[in-house]
């Protein structure tokens, strides 16, 4: 945005101490955060009965514990400083709404994140803090475009009723709705943006 300032901070979301220190650093340099978007994520591939505990912990620490650490510390700071209002937006996935063979740990972590949203929405509403989830379907990005252009990817798209993948730009409107005054009466909700994918099978 015109006149805005963007700054990056290194953060290990799986460490609560690191999260706390990072929020301290941000506050010192830029002031308190009004909108927290939890978007860190990772995955591993395999059936649940063949998944080792290290892979399970890696995914859960990033996809579920991390957002909880950030939300917990962020809410605590606002309470301590008597700040009202603010928004938390957790980026989940349609995999949090429906299972997918071979992607079990990720699905479980995202389902947990979606329910974390609901629980925190109940607990934070009295402070004017809204907590919501955005659950995208498959988005075409530089990371996955090679797969999506493959024969397997082209076949996979047949499962999407709109017969195309989404683009990162198509996330702008949903994000703005959930974190701006346009969505001032929305909390504890999950907005699915998937081209109708969940209407068919994953």
Label the model's feature ranges.
Residues 47-48, 55-60, 144, 156:
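Substrate-binding pocket helix/loop in short-chain dehydrogenase/reductase
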Residues 71, 109, 117:
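Active-site helix of classical SDR
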Residues 48-49, 98-104, 126-127, 163, ...:
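Active-site loop immediately N-terminal to the catalytic Tyr-X3-Lys motif
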């Amino acid at each position: 945005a015109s006149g805005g300032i963007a700054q990056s901070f290194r953060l290990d979301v799986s460490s609560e101490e690191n999260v706390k220190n990072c929020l301290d650093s941000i506050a010192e340099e830029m002031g308190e955060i009004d909108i927290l978007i939890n978007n860190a994520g990772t995955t591993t591939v395999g059936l649940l009965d063949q998944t080792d505990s290290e892979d399970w912990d890696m995914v859960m620490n990033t996809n579920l514990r991390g957002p909880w650490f950030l939300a917990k510390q962020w809410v605590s700071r606002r309470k301590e400083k008597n700040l009202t209002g603010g928004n938390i937006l957790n980026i989940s996935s349609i995999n949090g709404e429906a299972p997918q063979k071979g992607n079990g740990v990720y699905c479980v972590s995202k389902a947990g994140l979606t329910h974390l949203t609901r629980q925190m929405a109940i607990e934070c509403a009295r402070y004017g803090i809204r907590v919501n989830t955005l659950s995208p379907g498959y988005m075409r990005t530089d990371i996955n475009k090679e797969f999506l252009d493959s024969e397997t990817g082209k076949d996979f798209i047949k499962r999407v009723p709109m017969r195309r993948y989404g683009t990162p730009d198509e996330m702008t409107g949903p994000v703005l709705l959930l974190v701006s005054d346009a969505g001032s009466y929305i909390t504890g909700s999950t907005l699915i943006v998937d081209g109708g994918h969940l209407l068919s099978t994953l």
